[in-house]
């Protein structure tokens, strides 16, 4: 007998309980030690039950504006009265995030402006308030028509072109509130190890394709640097670096360009909804990536973090600039107020404040990485091509693990989750595989992993609508079953991509514990993304995510729909 002594002098037979240090040993631990103790039920819904599930109108597929906070009141509260003209601007996140001292420049500007007590031509006191929403999501909300702020300030002018394409014509008031730029942040040490030499957009792409750099990108439907990156990459792939000229929509139909994009996507190490989330993962695990796409402001801040002093920026694309526009429904008094605010924030004192938060003075871009601005048709095709080819020709396997314990009945959690799954089901590329497991007292396999088509989409919809909440929280029992299903799929298809999305509103109250699964998770080769749903202690979920270099997302009933849709769109 082979034995080791652990705390308290207990002898452990390592032949019966072998260490977990590989994918195969993780499977052995699951199949021989953990799964035999778990009772798994099956309750599959026939696809026919989904016949009564009607598609939601576009406006209902998007979050309500009230799900996002308002910022800007100098006293911390909103001063509504008949003598106040409140002017709402929907702003990109990097400059209006009230939670980050280094990312709240426009919030500071609004508070200072409001303290001036300026009045409009009709005598009302002007109050500017900001609602921070990712640029791409905000554009979708404006097009859908359910949200009508007075102004819009995305991170770049690309989103204005997409608005025009969809029939919403903005009026430019300020071409640039603050300077910024898209960059690839590259680890200097990793670049030297890959061969060194001139650090530029083209060589970075070549070494990523060669597997010499681990690179992260973000979703071009949401993220300005992500859209800028895809446009620049396709522009260079189409051969414009030498001859110049704008990328044309017809060029994106070429098989050679589509195959090149697919090959590149095979080499991308991570895709996250936004670069802000990817940066947080990178900060926790500096060795996870060698390079990542982001805004230059964020690069400057990341460079000051411990362990990131060797970062070098590779600028590309057009100036981002954060334009300010009025919208077709903006009233005359609102437009005048926006114009005043635009002049205020572009004044020298406010630009100095912006520089103190790492905005301004964007790095110059060489002509070989600076495509001319694209129109909405081209940008829309860039987004669609990314969605079609982002999996790099590999099958993506997504297992959904959903908490249906009794607490999910509170605060409309379960009904909003059903709605979110209904909407997100439309974001899945056909041919990828999706499965659904629920857990309360025990895990229940509701939909085994299966290729996604019209039939399986109908089954997913029917299954989602049939979810019911009751019982305790056997989180790790469910996690063990979901991991096993995905690891079996990986054995059959070692070239696939494997994701486990875990949604829970509480801590485990029965069954296995994290310690039972930690080494299995570590060696599973599965990307795990937990969602802490509601007002919960997310400490355990953060531990789960950290094991596989992931991030925890926080959701609530108001915002679970866009969150799950974004994760599906990015992963599937």
Which stretches of residues belong to each language-model region?
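Short beta-strand-loop
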Residues: 433-466, 483-492, 510-516, 538-546
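Ligand-binding pocket segment of bilobal, Venus flytrap-like solute-binding proteins
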Residues: 241-312
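N-terminal segment of the mature folded domain
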Residues: 19-222
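Von Willebrand factor
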Residues: 206, 393-452, 468, 478-480, ...
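VWA/integrin I-like adhesion module and closely mimicked acidic/polar interface patches used
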Residues: 504-558, 565-567
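Periplasmic-binding protein-like
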Residues: 174-183, 218-221, 258-264, 305-331, 335, 344-364, ...
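Acidic, polar low-complexity linker/tail segments
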Residues: 19, 23-43, 62-64, 357-400, ...
């Amino acid at each position: 007998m082979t034995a080791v002594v652990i705390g308290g002098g207990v002898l452990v037979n390592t032949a019966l309980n072998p260490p977990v240090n590989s994918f195969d040993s993780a499977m052995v631990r699951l199949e021989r030690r953990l799964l035999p103790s778990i009772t798994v039920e099956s309750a599959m819904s026939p696809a026919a039950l989904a016949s009564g599930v009607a598609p939601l109108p576009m406006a209902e597929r998007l979050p309500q504006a009230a799900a996002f906070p308002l910022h800007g009141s100098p006293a911390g509260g909103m001063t509504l009265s008949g003598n106040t003209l409140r002017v709402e601007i929907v702003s990109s996140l990097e400059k209006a995030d009230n939670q980050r001292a280094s990312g709240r420049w426009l919030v500071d500007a609004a508070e200072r402006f409001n303290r001036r007590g300026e009045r409009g031509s009709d005598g009302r006191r002007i109050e500017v308030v900001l609602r921070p929403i990712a640029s791409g999501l905000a554009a979708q909300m404006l097009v859908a028509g359910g949200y009508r702020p007075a102004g819009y300030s995305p991170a770049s002018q690309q989103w204005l072109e997409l608005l025009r394409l969809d029939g919403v014509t903005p009026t430019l008031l300020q071409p640039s509130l603050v300077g910024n730029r898209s960059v690839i942040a590259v680890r200097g040490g990793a670049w030297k190890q890959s061969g060194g030499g001139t650090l530029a957009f083209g060589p970075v792409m070549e070494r990523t394709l060669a597997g010499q750099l681990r690179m992260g990108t973000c979703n071009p439907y949401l993220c300005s640097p992500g859209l800028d990156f895809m446009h620049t990459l396709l522009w260079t792939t189409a051969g414009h670096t030498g001859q110049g000229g704008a990328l044309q929509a017809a060029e994106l139909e070429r098989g050679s360009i589509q195959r090149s994009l697919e090959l590149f996507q095979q080499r991308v190490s991570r895709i996250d909804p936004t670069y802000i989330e990817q940066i947080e993962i990178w900060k926790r695990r500096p060795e996870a990536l060698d390079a990542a796409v982001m805004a230059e402001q964020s690069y400057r801040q990341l460079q000051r973090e411990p362990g990131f002093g060797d970062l070098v920026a590779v600028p590309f694309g057009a100036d981002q600039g954060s334009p300010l526009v009025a919208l077709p429904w903006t009233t005359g008094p609102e437009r005048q107020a926006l114009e005043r605010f635009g002049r205020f924030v572009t004044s020298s004192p406010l630009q100095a404040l912006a520089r103190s938060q790492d905005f301004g003075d964007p790095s110059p871009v060489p002509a070989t990485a600076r495509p001319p601005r694209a129109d909405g048709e081209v940008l829309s095709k860039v987004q669609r091509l990314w969605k079609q080819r982002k999996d790099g020709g590999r099958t993506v396997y997504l297992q959904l693990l959903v908490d249906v314990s009794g607490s999910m009945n509170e605060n409309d959690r379960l009904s909003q989750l059903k709605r979110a799954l209904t909407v997100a089901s439309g974001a899945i590329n056909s041919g990828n595989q999706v499965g659904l497991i629920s857990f309360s007292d025990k895990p229940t396999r509701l939909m085994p992993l299966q290729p996604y088509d019209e039939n399986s989409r109908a089954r997913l919809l029917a299954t989602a609508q049939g979810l019911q909440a009751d019982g305790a929280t056997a989180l790790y029992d469910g996690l063990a079953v979901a991991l096993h299903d995905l690891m079996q799929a990986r054995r059959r298809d070692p070239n696939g991509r494997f994701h486990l999305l875990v949604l829970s509103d509480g801590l485990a109250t029965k069954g296995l514990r994290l310690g039972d699964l930690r080494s299995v998770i570590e060696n599973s080769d599965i990307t795990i993304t937990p969602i802490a749903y509601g007002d919960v202690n997310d400490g355990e979920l953060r531990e789960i995510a950290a094991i596989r270099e992931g991030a925890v997302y926080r959701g609530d009933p108001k915002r679970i729909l866009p969150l799950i849709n974004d994760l599906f769109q990015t992963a599937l």
